[in-house]
Regions:
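Residue-level detector of functionally pivotal "anchor" positions at catalytic/ligand-binding pockets or at interdomain
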Residues: 363, 694-718, 728
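Short carbohydrate-recognition loop motifs
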Residues: 564-588
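Extracellular carbohydrate-recognition regions
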Residues: 534-560
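Short beta-strand-plus-loop segments that form exposed binding edges in beta-rich domains
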Residues: 673-681
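Gly/Ser/Thr/Pro-rich low-complexity, intrinsically disordered segments
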Residues: 1-492, 496, 502-539, 672
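Terminal processing/anchoring signals of secreted or surface-associated proteins
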Residues: 700-705, 713-714, 723-725, 742, ...
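Short, surface-exposed loop/turn motifs with a glycine/proline- and acidic-biased composition
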Residues: 749-780
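Extracellular ligand-binding interfaces
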Residues: 582-661, 681-687, 694-697
């Protein structure tokens, strides 16, 4: 469980990750007995039909007003692109928007906030003051061919310009609408043989063909009553006073089990189709409602509706229905879509589900909650904590609350401790307890259980550190084959040479050049680590080519290979010139075989050279061959020159933007190879100068000629598009993608994590060609 907390009055939100599948799942649980929440069905842009449709996050934002805060939203019904309408019966605030089409089950919410599932059969009528009545065949029309019925009620959601021949009666309701309740009395505003139009307040009853002369005595100023009724069909009983209803297509589970004859009667066997999904469920008493959404992405596999229904049954659902899936699937919290689109792009939809707080606006903090309801961690492990602030109604005021000013304690104290960055350090004893956070007299509690861990060890036997970057000892343990990072601060550490480095809470900081042996003890457990400290300068020239007496050279295509100080380029105070003739041969290259063990932990390395036209034509690429501390081949970056004259080859010691692990240093440059283009050439000269390493001058900066860290985040595009970011302190990152028009189309908020470098795979595959803006907020920037 990644997150679990209340996002509104009686509205619980949970995010779960099943790594073994893999699957990411979101669920909301709504306590319908809470007086400050409602569930609403809404049409895109409040229009039927609506060929434009609307993103769920835009529905959420548009319909949030004071006292009507949309806490979460989901996509809902299947729809027709051409007609601009949903395919089943839906009810919005007591008004039927479209009555049947391909409809199957209905998931309804009554006026007293009770959920039910049934197969609906509409029986709707218009009744005049004189007692004449006519059956309403249809509600609203589609954009093209769905023009059903000889008696049609066009509601205030109608977006068509009515122009068909027939008889028109414009009406205005005196009260709210309801289905299976007291019929709605309306005033007759106009009666005409010419088209009349609907408005936000006015409906139009349209009569034609066999019903053209129905309600013959209706007059302006009289009453007309609209009765909307749903009667029993194949299963279930429609309740009284239905306020909201959602087409459920096939009923997947009914009365606690899979609904035989319904779940397995999905066209083309779609019940077994694996995709991302949105589904709805209810408890047996109808007072708890569930909505579930899953993601389909590179990191989350598809799943069928049967498996989701069984998951929901196991977690309290009694009836389960199926909403639209695939590219339409969307869960939105705080107007932000949480899942990645499942079919390659953001898809506007025809209608949605809103989970709404009707509580009065209140920005006063009355509650703090942790982002999880339970924490299960290994002993002596580290777990960053996240706090949420809420008002007295449980509306969220702020996520990822700043932890400054909080006092933390653990009960019992042996459970562990919480540092000033709100990182929990689990104790060394297996137990259960709780973490208590308190600020301004308001407390939050988090139940905690710690588990035993085996095979506790340090990941490396020997480590090289510098005098700038702190290094947390990489302590690991194992639970059932899963490796966990443990807390080195739980150990008592001794050093054979304390003058070269300092250790505090399991974190090393180099002081002066030297070596030490560290020993950590915890009860009967002992671990050891050899530490070498090499204090960093700003730069260090590893080769200035002043001494050429020991400079091994090798070539597959030259017998005249040499290096000298003759004929240096103008303005060069030092350096050397590599000179050779090239004869025809296979695999042509020239190699400088001198080896350089790089001092300390450089950020990057550079080599200056000067290329003539002849040298540029000869060189295919220049390759540096590095080995890591164990002597194995590690990295072979290649530089392809594209111009003549002075130039600098430079590489950062990173992969995909992430710095090489400290555990891999020291690195050794074994050779520099000039790979040549085929052919024969005479008197090729390559001037070389200053093989130089660059080092950080402080912990948060780096000197780097290629890989620039202007702030704390950078993007790489080597194979996949990735965003990399540094957390300088325990915290989270908020990453968003925007259009140039300022529309937010994706947001990802990481869990609170320990200081370090992290990677986010940018979901570019769902973006259409164009220009986008990516923003990241972390470290208070």
């Amino acid at each position: 469980t990644l997150e679990h907390y209340e996002i509104g009055p009686g509205i619980e939100y949970i995010k779960i990750r099943y790594e073994s599948v893999p699957l990411t799942l979101w669920a909301t649980t709504i306590d319908m007995t809470n007086p400050y929440n409602v569930i609403e069905q809404v049409q895109s842009n409040n229009s039927v039909p609506d060929l434009k449709r609307e993103l769920v996050q835009d529905m959420s934002k548009r319909l949030t007003t004071p006292g009507h805060k949309v806490c979460a939203a989901f996509n809902h019904d299947f729809f027709s692109y051409d007609e601009g309408v949903c395919i089943g019966l839906n009810i919005s605030n007591g008004v039927i928007s479209m009555p049947a089409g391909s409809g199957r089950s209905t998931f309804a919410i009554t006026q007293d906030k009770t959920a039910s599932v049934f197969f609906p059969v509409p029986e709707c009528k218009a009744i005049s003051a004189s007692g004449d009545e006519v059956t309403i065949d249809h509600f609203n029309w589609g954009a093209e061919t769905i023009r059903n019925g000889d008696c049609v009620l066009f509601t205030n959601m109608n977006s068509l310009n009515l122009d068909a021949e027939g008889r028109y009666i414009k009406i205005r309701p005196r009260s709210n609408w309801i289905v299976n309740g007291t019929p709605t009395v309306c005033d007759v505003l106009e009666v005409s043989d010419l088209p009349l139009q609907t408005s936000d307040t006015d409906f139009v009853l349209y009569l034609r063909n066999t019903k053209l002369n129905s309600l013959p005595d209706i007059k302006v100023g009289e009453e007309i009553t609209i009765s909307q009724k749903l009667v029993a069909g194949k299963f279930g009983t429609p309740p009284d006073n239905i306020l909201q209803a959602f087409h459920g297509y096939p009923s997947i589970a009914y009365e606690g089990k899979l609904h035989d004859g319904e779940y397995n009667d999905f066209e083309n066997g779609r019940e077994y189709e694996t995709s991302c999904r949105t589904m709805a469920g209810m408890s047996q008493d109808g007072k708890t409602v569930y909505f579930v959404a899953t993601e389909l992405s590179e990191n989350s596999t598809g799943i069928n509706c049967i498996d989701i229904a069984n998951w929901m049954l196991a977690h309290g659902a009694w009836n389960v229905v199926n909403f639209d899936s695939g590219g339409s699937t969307a869960i939105v919290v705080d107007h932000t879509m949480l899942n990645l689109p499942g079919r390659g792009s953001l898809r506007p939809v025809m209608d949605g589900v809103l989970l709404v707080s009707t509580a009065p606006e209140d920005n006063g903090v009355a509650h703090y909650s942790f982002s999880k309801t339970q924490l299960n961690v290994p002993i002596i492990s580290l777990a960053p904590l996240t706090l949420i602030s809420q008002n007295k109604y449980k509306d969220v005021i702020e996520r990822n609350v700043e932890v400054e000013g909080f006092a933390f304690r653990c009960e019992p104290a042996e459970l562990g401790w919480v540092d000033k960055g709100a990182v929990f350090h689990a104790g060394e004893t297996v137990m259960s307890g709780k973490i208590i956070a308190e600020k301004n007299g308001i407390t939050a509690e988090l139940p905690v259980s710690t588990r035993p861990v085996q095979d506790i060890h340090i990941a490396a036997d020997e480590i090289l550190i510098d005098s700038v970057r702190p290094y947390r000892i990489n302590l690991e343990g194992n639970i059932n084959g899963q490796v966990y990072t443990l807390d080195p601060a739980a150990f008592a550490w001794t050093s054979s040479n304390p003058s070269c480095c300092r250790i505090e809470n399991g974190i090393l900081k180099g002081i002066e050049n030297g070596e030490t042996s560290l020993v950590g003890t915890l009860d009967t457990i002992t671990v050891g680590l050899k530490v070498i400290v090499e204090v960093t300068p700003e730069t260090l020239v590893h080769e200035n080519f002043s001494d050429l007496s020991d400079f091994p050279l090798f070539s597959t295509v030259s017998n005249t290979l040499s290096i000298s100080h003759e004929e240096l380029p103008t303005g060069w105070p030092d350096g050397a010139v590599l000179q050779f003739d090239q004869k025809t041969g296979r695999n042509p290259y020239v190699e400088m075989g001198k080896s350089y063990r790089l001092y300390s932990l450089p950020d990057s390395i550079s080599l200056q050279l000067n290329l003539s036209k002849e040298a540029l034509a000869a060189i295919k690429h220049i390759r540096f061959d590095f080995t890591h501390k164990n002597g194995k081949s590690y990295w072979q970056p290649e530089y392809i020159p594209s111009d003549t004259g002075d130039q600098t080859i430079a590489w950062a010691f990173s992969k995909n933007g992430i710095a090489f692990p400290t555990e891999d240093f020291p690195l050794t440059l074994d050779r520099i190879r000039f790979v040549l283009n085929p052919g024969s050439r005479s008197e090729i000269t390559i001037p070389l100068r200053e093989l130089k390493a660059y080092y950080p001058v402080k912990a948060s900066s780096a000197i780097n000629n290629v890989h620039i860290e202007n702030n704390f985040a950078w993007i790489t595009a080597e194979g996949e598009l990735r965003l990399h970011y540094n957390l300088q302190q325990t915290g989270s990152a908020d990453i968003s993608i925007w259009t140039t028009a300022g529309q937010q189309i994706s947001e990802y908020i990481s869990n609170r994590e320990l200081p370090g470098t992290y990677t986010y795979n940018i979901p570019d595959r769902f973006l259409s060609p164009g220009i986008y803006i990516l923003t990241i907020r972390a470290n208070g920037k």
